[in-house]
Curated annotation (Swiss-Prot):
InterPro entries found in the cross-reference section: HD (IPR001356), Homeodomain-like_sf (IPR009057), NOBOX (IPR042988)
GO molecular function annotations of the record: DNA-binding transcription factor activity, RNA polymerase II-specific; RNA polymerase II cis-regulatory region sequence-specific DNA binding; sequence-specific DNA binding
Record disease entry: Premature ovarian failure 5: An ovarian disorder defined as the cessation of ovarian function under the age of 40 years. It is characterized by oligomenorrhea or amenorrhea, in the presence of elevated levels of serum gonadotropins and low estradiol.
Region Disordered, residue ranges: 94-233, 366-385, 394-437, 635-691
Ranges annotated as DNA-binding: 272-363
Biased composition (Basic and acidic residues): 94-103, 679-691
GO cellular component: chromatin; nucleus
Protein name per the record: Homeobox protein NOBOX
Length: 691
């Protein structure tokens, strides 16, 4: 059974389209007769779909009903008259534009309901773009064109046909979607069978079956037929021109959709390369000045900076441009002004961002340099891998008394804790008011338990020879510096460094004043009289007399001091008080000359890795302390007894009394005379020191 679709045009007469199983056909000549139906001049019938047993009228009503009568004919009595084959491939159009609310479609029979549901989307889609203004404008009033003639030209003028057909040969164009507000057109559907018609007219409207001739459809050359010459959506059959049209339509729509979707992203996703902003020297100076004031300017300040500096808008940045319009008043800036300010502020933001990165980099480099090179001008103790404290030089005020050149002295504590000394016995002083500098620590060799004996071990740069431990005739500490406080210091562990690396003082000043080296100067009283330690990282050195060395023994009640290399029991060890202080007494005369450039002490009372065996000392010698300082060559020294040990009371404080004033007057003391020497020294100490 062939399915006939008749589409008419309001402008042309004598043409109409039919569709059967072989495809779409355009026919010329008198249109096929359809059963009569109500129509008036403003009823624009733009589609008549029919078959042998039924037909559907697609119409749009704009005014009251008028009946159009036409002779009754069999719907498809002469279906083939002057056929012209036209290939029809097109897109979809909607059928519902210009509808009014309040119109209900005609009821269709049960057999046609299925056809209506299947073809309704296509019919709705094909209506809107093909309707002439008379159908698309709601409320438009047109004078009635026809009344009572069956095949009149005005009665046959209908709206332009849709561009789509039913998707299957058993389906046809169907009812419209549910009516929406403001729409006047509806797609009433009437089921017509031979000798019997059933339809439900709209409320308030009386309809009679009328027969009307099908109005001809438009041809491609007509003035208003551009919309009428259409290519309907192809059907769903798999054979013939309909199938080809379906394929072509699907491909065309998919290509259009793909082009439509892909087109805009290509335009919006264009990536613009960033250009560098070139600044003049005056702009850079201004920006640098502002950066020194504030490293992190906010958006308002960046905008002010951009206006002040006059940055040209050379690129647009996303960051920093969001809050540029905040706070503006008045009529409001134009789009060009906003873009200009945004660009300028963004450029200023980029400059500050780069400048902060450079600033952080410089801060890191400066921090590393300050760690590598400490800011203190004095020497550090060492750069070893221990966690020992870095000991910088401690400058001291110069003294008016002339000081000969001397080398740093080291201490020799107990073996487990090698203590460091960063202080010289008699600090060096240049000829004119320079400051004396504390020397780096010198470490003792690891011998057996012994006292803290500070000895000059480092070399000096002058080769002069000088007498050692000479007492000035009639010298008394009262005429030198007055009472001297103890060198109140604390003890720190030395870093495990090589001893030979620390023999040379890192910072010391040499004097150009020739003369004998004398331990005749006490430290500055104002600096060291306070009981609180001024140099808390130095071991204790209570130097009390011009010619004496006062040493604190370890807090060991069983402390034994080796008095000579011979190791004799009666002479080699002098048991001392647990809390007393050892005072070293110089020999009673010139015992020879020694060079400070020789770091070895041949007659020290203890063995060491760098000090050779005592030169020429008799095994059972008479002195507790042999000659302290060696000569450059093993020459015979005066065998004067070394300074005897004197013990100070526990509460005694080193002061200005002549501890060893009788040293020159005493003859060389034998080992049997040592107790009397100790008693004399103790008595003198009690008389001379103020507790």
């Amino acid at each position: 059974m062939a399915l006939l679709l008749t589409l008419t045009s309001p402008d042309l007469e004598g043409t109409w389209d039919t569709r059967d199983k072989d495809g779409f056909k355009a026919q010329e000549g008198p249109p096929l007769a359809v059963p009569e139906f109500p129509v008036c001049g403003l009823y624009r019938i733009y589609g008549v779909c029919g078959s042998f047993s039924s037909f559907f009228i697609i119409r749009c009503s704009l005014c009251a009903l008028e009946t159009l009568k036409s002779p009754q004919h069999d719907p498809l009595e002469i279906p083939e008259q002057s056929l012209k084959l036209i290939p029809l491939v097109s897109g979809k159009r909607e059928l519902t534009r210009g509808q009014k609310a309040g119109e209900k479609p005609l009821a269709a029979g049960p057999g046609e309901e299925e056809l209506l549901r299947g073809s309704a989307p296509h019919a709705q889609d094909t209506q809107s773009e093909e309707l002439p203004p008379s159908c698309t404008i709601s409320g438009e009033k047109k004078p009635p064109a026809v009344s009572g003639e069956a095949t009149g030209a005005d009665a046959g003028r209908l709206c332009p046909p849709p561009r789509s057909r039913a998707p299957h040969k058993d389906r046809t164009l169907a009812r419209s979607r549910p009516q929406t507000q403001g729409e006047d057109c509806s797609l009433p559907v009437g089921e017509v069978k031979i000798g019997k018609r059933s339809y439900s007219p709209a409320p308030g409207k009386q309809k009679k079956p009328n027969a009307m001739g099908l109005a001809p459809t438009s041809s491609p050359g007509a003035p208003n037929s551009a919309r009428a010459t259409h290519n309907p959506v192809p059907c769903g059959s798999g054979r013939g021109p309909c199938h080809l049209a379906n394929l072509l339509s699907t491909l065309a729509q998919s290509n259009q959709n793909r082009d439509h979707k892909q087109g805009p992203p290509e335009v919006t996703c264009q990536i613009r390369k960033k250009t560098r902003t070139l600044y003049r020297s005056d702009q850079l100076e201004e920006l640098e000045k502002i950066f020194q004031e504030d490293h992190y300017p906010d958006s308002d300040k960046r905008r002010e900076i951009a206006q002040t500096v006059g940055v040209t808008p050379q690129r647009i940045m996303v960051k920093g441009a969001g809050s540029l319009v905040a706070g503006w008043s008045g009529g409001g800036p134009t789009i060009e002004t906003l873009e200009l300010q945004s660009e300028r502020s963004a450029v200023a933001w980029v400059w500050f961002q780069n400048r902060r990165a450079k600033w952080r980099k410089m801060e890191k480099l400066n921090g590393k340099e300050s760690k590598d090179n400490p800011a203190a001008p004095g020497p550090a103790s060492s750069q070893c891998s221990s966690a020992a404290e870095i000991l910088p030089a401690v400058p001291m005020e110069p003294k008016p008394d002339p000081f000969p050149q001397e080398s740093p002295l080291d201490t020799f504590p107990e073996p487990p804790m090698l203590l460091t000394s960063d202080q010289t016995l008699a600090p060096t002083q240049p000829s004119e008011g320079a400051q004396r500098v504390v020397t780096p620590p010198l470490f003792s060799p690891p011998p057996v338990r012994r006292a803290d004996l500070p000895f000059p071990l480092g070399p000096v740069h002058t080769p002069q020879l000088m007498p050692l431990l000479m007492d000035v005739a009639g010298s008394d500490s009262s005429h030198k510096d007055g009472p001297c406080g103890s060198w109140g210091t604390s003890i720190t562990l030395p870093p495990p460094c090589s001893y030979l690396e620390e023999l040379e003082p890192q910072d010391y000043q040499q004097s150009n004043q020739p003369g004998p080296f004398q331990f005749s100067q006490a430290p500055q009283p104002p600096l060291f009289q306070s009981p609180q330690p001024k140099l808390p990282y130095l071991p204790t050195f209570p130097f009390s007399m011009p010619s004496s060395l006062t040493l604190p023994p370890p807090e060991d009640s069983l402390f034994m001091f080796p008095c000579g290399p011979s190791g004799g029991t009666s002479q080699g060890y002098c048991p001392g008080a647990s809390s007393g202080q050892i005072l070293m007494q110089p020999p009673a005369g010139n015992i020879g000359t020694a060079s400070w450039s020789d770091p070895c002490l041949p007659e020290l009372p203890f063995p060491g890795p760098f000090c050779p065996q005592a030169l020429g000392h008799p095994p059972g010698g008479d002195g507790y302390f042999p000659d302290l300082f060696p000569t450059p060559c093993p020459q015979a020294l005066g065998r004067q007894p070394s300074s005897a040990l004197s013990w100070m009371p526990e509460g005694a404080r080193p002061g200005t009394g002549p501890l060893l004033s009788k040293a020159k007057e005493e003859p060389p003391a034998a080992s049997l005379d040592q107790p009397s020497a100790l008693e004399e020294a103790r008595g003198d100490d009690k008389n001379s020191h103020v507790p």
